[in-house]
């Protein structure tokens, strides 16, 4: 017997919430060119009080992104409205409807922003909720769908590129499908996928006003991004200097593996170099695609090299990171072969222990989600496209 559409939609919402929670903990599941579903936009006029940031080259690109979701009906155990904010793909400041808690997952950002700035950021979440709910209510009413469960999603933000310029992005999605994308060059909305002229007109007339979207993408978002970036720079006082640690491990094949690990990296660019008699023999430069998050807003990296027993004292590891140039010798005392020097514990999901725990949690949640989908909806096929994960039902 086929189950009702509402029951199927409810199961889909559960799976989508699981994805959001996993992404909140582990980061995005796929890299993309900011091709995420995006939510509603402000309808009322916005008074611009932010000064447009100066164009200044940066060592690496930075991104500020907002992911919003609204449900057309209340579902027990699920938030009717959810907002996630990401700085360089790391979540902070989650907001859920029916919850009085709006706290930053990146405390250094909150600590170094002025109180009035942080309050304004929090108040904006309430406005975004009302705007998104209003848009969803209008869409479902026009289509005669106000008795069914539907989802309206939004993704928007901006990227600071290496040459100092910025570009914005804004997308809207309905029931897991992209339907509107804002073109920042032409200042127009385009309907994704094939559609009749009537449907195109319907969606475009309900999209956020182009002038307000332009103001947000050109002025407000870049200014917020610059503030967050400055906040993290100031946060270096809390994290201290980068830390370099060298460990070794003896293998029975007559070689020793030296591993150089760098912690407390405050940007996603670093270079680790193995030196023998102070001359480089192996070098690796880490960027946004290869460096690892530590889970506390900083990053870490490592590089290994194999040497003959007795050569440890010839080697040292060099870290170049921002204005820091740190050298760490490979051996300050005679190693005990066959043993492994104890490594200091690391905090956050970037550590090995953290990764194993989160891996176990991921497996459990996937099994639960799969079981739920089998019982309520039949098999589901998950897919990741352009950084946004969704699913297809296999009938």
UniProtKB/Swiss-Prot annotation:
Matching SUPFAM superfamilies: Immunoglobulin, MHC antigen-recognition domain
UniProt's post-translational modification comment states: N-glycosylated.
The segment annotated Alpha-3 runs over: 241-337
Q: Where is this region: Disordered?
A: 332-352
For this UniProt record, the keywords arranged alphabetically read as follows: Cell membrane, Disulfide bond, Glycoprotein, GPI-anchor, Lipoprotein, Membrane, Signal
- Say if the entry is tagged with keyword Cell membrane: yes
What the entry lists under InterPro entries is as follows: Ig-like_dom, Ig-like_dom_sf, Ig-like_fold, Ig_C1-set, MHC_class-I_related, MHC_I-like_Ag-recog, MHC_I-like_Ag-recog_sf, MHC_I/II-like_Ag-recog
In what way does this protein cross or attach to the membrane?
Lipid-anchor; GPI-anchor
- Annotated region Connecting peptide: the residues are 338-368
The record's listing under Pfam families reads:
C1-set (PF07654), MHC_I (PF00129)
UniProt GO cellular component terms: external side of plasma membrane
> Where are the annotated segments for Alpha-1?
57-148
Instruction: Report the principal subcellular site.
Output: membrane
What span is annotated as the signal peptide, if there is one?
1-32
Maturation propeptide residues: 370-395
- Expression sites by tissue: Expressed in stomach, intestine, uterus, skeletal muscle and heart.
Which cystines does this chain contain?
158-221, 260-317
- Glycosylated residues, per the record, are 98, 163, 199
Kindly state the subunit structure of this protein. Heterodimer with B2M.
The protein's name: MHC class I-like protein MILL1
Annotated source species: Mus musculus
